[in-house]
From Swiss-Prot:
Its EC number is 6.1.1.4. InterPro entries: aa-tRNA-synth_I_CS, aa-tRNA-synth_Ia, Leu-tRNA-ligase, Leu_tRNA-synth_edit, M/V/L/I-tRNA-synth_anticd-bd, Methionyl/Leucyl_tRNA_Synth, Rossmann-like_a/b/a_fold, tRNAsynth_Ia_anticodon-bd. Belongs to the class-I aminoacyl-tRNA synthetase family. A motif ('HIGH' region) lies at residues 50-60. It comes from the Bacteria. HAMAP family: Leu_tRNA_synth_B. It comes from Hydrogenovibrio crunogenus (strain DSM 25203 / XCL-2). Its main location: cytoplasm. This is Leucine--tRNA ligase. Keywords: Aminoacyl-tRNA synthetase, ATP-binding, Cytoplasm, Ligase, Nucleotide-binding, Protein biosynthesis. The keyword ATP-binding applies. One of its GO terms (molecular function) is aminoacyl-tRNA deacylase activity. One of its GO terms (biological process) is leucyl-tRNA aminoacylation.
Length: 877
């Protein structure tokens, strides 16, 4: 460094003054501003950017501390590091806060950004703030609008009717999570399913590439790749047609279904269609029960999770179709578990071999016909549940005896000859619906002209700016009611036209921010290709496992869209992925007679434990009221068990919080909060501080660089030091197990504390040990490490110091410990010179006081020496 603003070194560790001074120096010298530099290996470290909700929580702190530690470590490896930060600023919470507080979402968002930016700086996070983005800024979202218009021209965007959750009171579309027990979360009235026109991106055009390119991602957790594979859901099966038998005119064609289990075709006893399937609607005319059922289904959530758990219901439509092979009539039922938006909106139902079909058949007394047996000559037991495994076909006529796998080919052949079926590869993945009937989002750049139709907004007119002074009232779309936004001129014919009043799904913004960071100041293009290609792909991406599917899949998709637009050269956005675990804490509540729960902060409760130390209950510190223990659960506002990071920074300093976060658990595992462990981290930093201050109080010396002329004790400390350095380097660089790296430094400090040698050589060894300890801790505790680095006599920034290298000579032991066994049992230990020969080792073993008790007066039958490890003396008598 040095700087006048640094506080003078003191024997007392005073984190607040130290941290403020050092952060000032970082800002003043712009040490984290990254520039393209081909002379160094680049390292782009990115943590998922936050939604500016108002305050950082411990989940944020963990995510961002991990990223900062990785960045600082890689910088000390000599790499050119980029670590940016920004804000995922659009979204529903801002609208809700606006309605609650009568303030424009823009104002609320920008205030939160300012506050949270300061919190991030207080944590000592080394971000390049010159690259900061906020997705609600027009200079950011103009480029996603531009990309949308390019995709529109390429045919990768289309508009179609789609079913949504509609709140009839608020006159607005609800996200699935806003539907509570079938009712709107604000209005409390039953929601309706409604078809409205929405925009979609053809992500299915990239389904195969998104699937196969997962194999490139060797630095991703297998769990995440498996989740994405399952979400994409590639399958091979048959599309089968069931011709109309009765109940509808034959002009309606056949009912098409897709199945991955054609081996069960001969066990079909009914076909189920979605309640809003065209056939069901036609059949509902003059069919009151069916009409009522369709109306009932229009009020249930479209969320897949809800569909899985709800009671399965249905009504016979009266329509009959012909089994494609037997010609038997099969009833068509309208069922609430079939969605029109998935596949053909119809499924063939085989109760004997599908549990959902089985339960439905039992409920409505439909036939159950087993056509798969576990093995030839056996029968499947379907008396209590469906047999869902594959096996051998039975009761299947010409297909009897075939194995399930063989049946796919045989069924395809027969159905192909009949013109009623063909092999098909399907994907579970659906095109991405990107329209949101929200105000606080990026406007979709489309103009509707009565004469010319839907047109992209011309590039010269971008961005389509979102008015920032609107305060939503929760009813309808604010933009649709705002003529100053909605009314416009057709870019093609010049006539009166209307703007699209929907906004993009907020996943749109977070799908390309990683790329925009590389070109933050590029005003004339979405990306500066040279800069993007310099930094991309991201070398280390860090975020929660909850983003394993949607965000990470959409970001991969967007990266490929940008590649195909010539904006980037890489196929994938993120080379390595670390998914950090959640932060957990104890929880406490009371419950009234109506079952309503009130949650209390752990800071306000005194736990009561049983004789084994297990928590059984608690009492409020304020008045002694008894409270129930809710267990260790995720920190959350709703459970009132979060810990405010700011409080801990004020009390202990940022370095203590950072050190605790990195030490408490491996990054990919959950972290269980412990106040006492935070205090322990603070005590450790104080010990390091005092150790350095004690050493430098009599002056600094040159650090030791070799084992020449050192005593046994001095060599032992150097051995411990370089063994620790070897472990810490591997733990932090390759394994990313920061907790074990920190544990190793704690062990090292214990050895340093025990080393009492004020000779010149001893002080030189101590200087080396303390310097390396400070360097090893510096990624976790950058402020204290900077101050201690200066105290040890160094100028400049510790984060620019090259990571120390292991002295292999220090790892060589002059003496080694040998186990002494007698008749295979451990009887003693000896220390001998590392180069001692067999005779010397045996002599020392026999002279060992403990071992001699079992050897003296007995005949030695055999002597075994395993070099460097043990001696075994076999005796008898």
């Amino acid at each position: 460094m040095t700087t006048e603003s640094m506080p003078e070194s003191t024997n007392d560790y005073q984190p607040q003054s130290i941290e403020a001074a050092i952060q000032h120096v970082w800002d003043e010298q712009q040490v984290f501003v990254a520039k393209e530099d081909d002379s160094k290996e680049k390292f782009y470290c990115l943590s998922m950017f936050p939604y500016p909700s108002g305050k950082l929580h411990m989940g944020h702190v963990r995510n961002y501390t991990i990223g900062d530690v990785v960045s600082r470590f890689q910088r000390m490896q000599g790499k050119n590091v980029l670590q940016p930060m920004g804000w995922d600023a659009f979204g529903l919470p801002a609208e809700n806060a606006a309605m609650d507080n009568q303030v424009a979402p823009a104002k609320w968002t920008y205030q939160n950004i300012d506050y949270m930016r300061n919190q991030l700086k207080r944590l000592g996070l080394g971000y390049d703030w010159t690259r900061e983005v906020a997705t609600c800024h027009p200079e950011y979202y103009r480029w996603e609008q531009w990309l949308f218009t390019r995709l529109m021209e390429k045919g990768l965007v289309y508009r179609k009717l789609s079913v949504v959750n509609w709140d009839p009171v608020d006159q607005t579309v609800l996200a699935n999570e806003q539907v509570i027990d079938g009712k709107g979360w604000r209005s409390g009235v039953p929601v309706e399913r409604k078809e409205i026109a929405q925009w979609f991106l053809r992500i299915t055009d990239y389904a195969e590439e998104l699937l196969t390119d997962l194999d490139q991602l060797e630095g991703w957790p297998e769990q995440v790749k498996t989740m994405q594979k399952n979400w994409i859901g590639k399958s091979t099966g048959l599309e089968i047609e069931f011709p109309i038998a009765s109940g509808l005119d034959e002009s309606n064609g056949s009912l098409k279904v897709y199945t991955t289990r054609p081996d069960t075709l001969m066990g079909v006893t009914y076909v189920a269609v979605a309640a809003d399937h065209p056939w069901a609607r036609k059949a509902s005319v003059n069919n009151e029960p069916l009409e009522r059922f369709i109306e009932e289904c229009s009020h249930i959530s479209t969320a897949e999770a809800d569909m899985e758990t709800m009671e399965k219901k249905g009504v016979d439509t009266g329509i009959r179709v012909k089994h494609p092979i037997t010609g038997d009539e099969v009833p068509v039922w309208a069922a609430n578990f079939v969605l029109m938006g998935y596949g053909t909106g119809a499924v063939m139902s085989v109760p004997a071999h599908d549990q959902r079909d089985y339960e439905f058949a039992k409920a409505y007394d439909l036939p159950i016909k087993a056509v798969i047996a576990p093995k030839a000559g056996e029968e499947a037991d379907v008396s209590e549940a469906a047999f869902t495994e594959k096996g051998v076909l039975v009761n299947s006529g010409q297909f009897d005896g075939l194995k399930s796998k063989q049946a796919l080919h045989e069924m395809a052949k027969v159905l192909g000859e009949l013109g009623l079926g063909e092999k098909q590869t399907n994907y579970r993945l659906r095109d991405w619906g990107i329209s949101r009937q929200r105000y606080w989002g990026c406007p979709i750049p489309v103009i509707y002209c009565p004469a010319c139709g839907a047109l992209p907004v011309p590039e010269k007119d971008l961005p389509v700016r979102l008015p920032e002074d609107v305060v939503p009232d929760g009813s309808g779309s604010p933009l649709a009611k705002l003529d100053s936004f909605k009314k416009c001129e057709c870019p093609q014919c010049g006539g009166p036209a209307n703007r699209e009043t929907d906004t993009f799904d907020t996943f749109f913004e977070s799908s390309w921010y990683h790329a925009r960071y590389t070109s933050r100041h590029e005003d004339n293009a979405m990306l500066d290709k040279a800069a993007a290609d310099h930094w991309l792909p991201v070398d280390q991406y860090i975020g929660g496992i909850e983003h394993a599917i949607l965000h990470l899949l959409y970001a991969r998709f967007f990266h490929k869209l940008m590649r195909d637009e010539g904006l980037v050269s890489s196929d994938e956005p993120f080379k390595n992925l670390l998914t950090q675990g959640m932060v957990l804490a104890g929880s406490w509540f009371t419950q009234d007679e109506k079952g309503k729960q009130t949650w209390y902060s752990p800071l306000d409760v005194d736990p009561v434990t049983d004789d084994k130390g297990a928590i059984v209950k608690g009492t409020l510190k304020s008045d002694g009221t008894e409270v129930q223990y809710g267990g260790i659960i995720k920190m959350s506002k709703s459970k009132n068990n979060g810990i405010d990071p700011q409080t801990l920074i004020d009390q202990y300093g940022a370095d203590t919080l950072r050190l605790y976060i990195m030490f408490a658990s491996p990054p990919e595992q959950t972290l269980e909060w412990s106040d006492s462990a935070v205090e322990g981290a603070h005590r450790f930093l104080n010990r390091v501080w005092r150790q350095v201050q004690t050493h430098v109080s009599t002056g600094v010396v040159a650090a030791c660089t070799s084992n020449d002329d050192l005593t046994k004790e001095q060599k032992a400390l150097r051995l411990k030091l370089h063994t620790t350095l070897q472990k810490v380097t591997d733990d932090m660089g390759r394994r990313m197990h920061f907790n074990t790296a920190i544990a190793a430094t704690m062990e090292l400090l214990n050895d340093i504390s025990r080393f009492k040698d004020e000779s010149d050589a001893g002080r030189s060894v101590m200087q080396e040990a303390l310097e390396m300890l400070v360097l090893m801790l510096s990624p976790m505790t950058p402020h204290a490490s900077q101050a201690l680095w200066e105290a040890l006599g160094h100028d400049g920034l510790v984060l620019n110091v090259t990571w120390p290298t292991v002295d292999d000579a220090a790892l060589v032991k002059d003496e080694i410990e040998i186990m002494v066994q007698v008749n295979g049992k451990l009887r003693g230990k000896i220390e001998v010179a590392a180069e001692a020969d067999k005779d010397t080792i045996l002599a020392a073993a026999k002279a060992n006081e403990q071992a001699a008790k079992f050897i003296d007066g007995k005949d030695i039958v055999k002597e075994i020496v395993v070099p460097g490890r043990l001696v075994n003396i076999v005796v008898k008598g």
